[in-house]
Amino acid sequence: MHSSRWFILIAVMMAFTPVVVDMTILHIAIPSLAVALGASGNEVLWIIDIYPLVMAGLLVPMGTLADRIGYRRILLIGLGVFGAASIAAAFSTSAPMLIVARALLGIGSSMIMPCVLALIRQTFEDDAERATALGIWSVVSMAGAAIGPLVGGVLLEHFWWGSVFLVNVPIMLIVIPVVWRLVPSSSGNSQATWKPGQALILVAGLILTVYGVKSGFKTGLSVETAVTLFVGVGLLAWFSRIQISSENPMLDLSLLTKPAIAVGLMMAFVASGSLAGFELVLAQELQFVLDKTPLEAGVFMLPLVVAAAIGGPVGGQLANRYGLRAVASSSMAAAALALFAISLSDLVENAYIVAVLLVVLGFALGVGLLASSIAIMGSAPAEKAGAAGALESTGYELGGGLGITIFGVLVNSIYRSAFANPVAADGVSNSISEAMTAAREIGGSDGLEIAVAAKAAFAEAHGSVLVLVAAMIALLSALVFIALRNAPKAEAH
């Protein structure tokens, strides 16, 4: 047993915290950086969703690589990549440069996350201590994501948008030597199977498909867009075929033949996607439409993210008491009702009502994520628990990335249709960030007219998308109720 095991836990939690904070901190900074970099609507979406998309494809292979060459080594490399990418992101001078930096952050995160969990399990040999350590990891995970918007708001109140990335650097400078000193080295298992080619196929397929979807919504189905979509979907189909035919796949898709696992993965995908997509769009409405400062926007969003963090632990107790089927389906139904009610609410005049609705939404999605985990892990055979966990973590990250894409392209598409360009300025109907940039540059009464028209169009788009997503989640609630009809009361995982 490691004598310094609790210090090792502190070290890996320090390494883990920036990763989870980075999942939400950028939402608050998007309006500021979009204007500063002159980012288009599609570029804004890439800045946000490239991070979880890269993570979704690399989490499993990076975990396997760490098994092969040692967790300490991969963790240190991941921390170095994360720190360097944070510097590159903070000082990016263009949207494409920031997108590349965010992709590098995703690579660093995909190296850090599996090592953190593996080191906890390796360091704490006593079952009771390991459970305590994993509980601390869970709290840090939820709290980090919850405080992200607030931390972002505080930083942007005093510094420029790059500060939300630069804040990672001093943490890395402390964590790297601490990990080097405290975490013991290990030789790893050279027999562990590592298949980087499959990961590259998955990441390339995801990026090309998402690019095609975004381009198609913005400019229509051109030849270039159609070819991109065809290649992207083809790569994803190829990846799926490899997984099904392989004796040792990167992701065991055969688990999806079990209805509870399939619907659980769908819940993880939808819940994480809805939370991420809604946070992004809400942050833009609060700052662009309602003229709130980043700090005010962060405080406004706090009920949502805190309730989501609380929903997970409470969801396990609810599932044990009332059964997985009832809790899973009702959490999705509550989320759908909350989204629909928010779409009808005035965020200014009904601020307190909206705050309550945000609590309901966040709590419901948090419970839904925990219920999805119980459905997946509780239905997987014991010998495939690791494969089920890999499928769940990939689905969670993929849901976050694609949720942002879906929310973003729908909002931008409806915004373009609803926008009445009073001055006929170029580009202002593409996205609200481009419209607000143009309004500031033009100034005067013309600039004011553009800003007013953009705000009205975005508010309409936001409300319409919330109704669409609410309807989708309501259908999922019914599907969950049907698919989990034989699910017993389950212990939380």
Enumerate the language-model features and the residues they cover.
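Intrinsic disorder in cytosolic terminal tails and internal cytosolic loops
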Residues: M1-H2, G444-A453, A483-H493
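12-transmembrane solute porter fold
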Residues: R5-V21, L26-I28, L37, G41, ...
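Structural signature of transmembrane alpha-helices in multi-pass secondary transporters
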Residues: V19, I48-Y51, M55, G106, ...
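Interfacial helix-cap and linker-helix signal at transmembrane-aqueous boundaries
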Residues: L33-A34, L65-A66, V151-F159, V213, ...
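Central cavity-lining transmembrane alpha-helices of secondary-active solute carriers
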Residues: D49-G63, M113-L117, L302-V314
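Small-residue-rich packing faces within the transmembrane alpha-helices of Major Facilitator Superfamily
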Residues: A56, G83-A84, V169-I176, L236, ...
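Helix-loop-helix hairpins in multi-pass membrane proteins, especially solute transporters
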Residues: T64-G197, V348
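Hydrophobic transmembrane-helix bundles of small-molecule transporters
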Residues: G135, E157-F269, S274, V281, ...
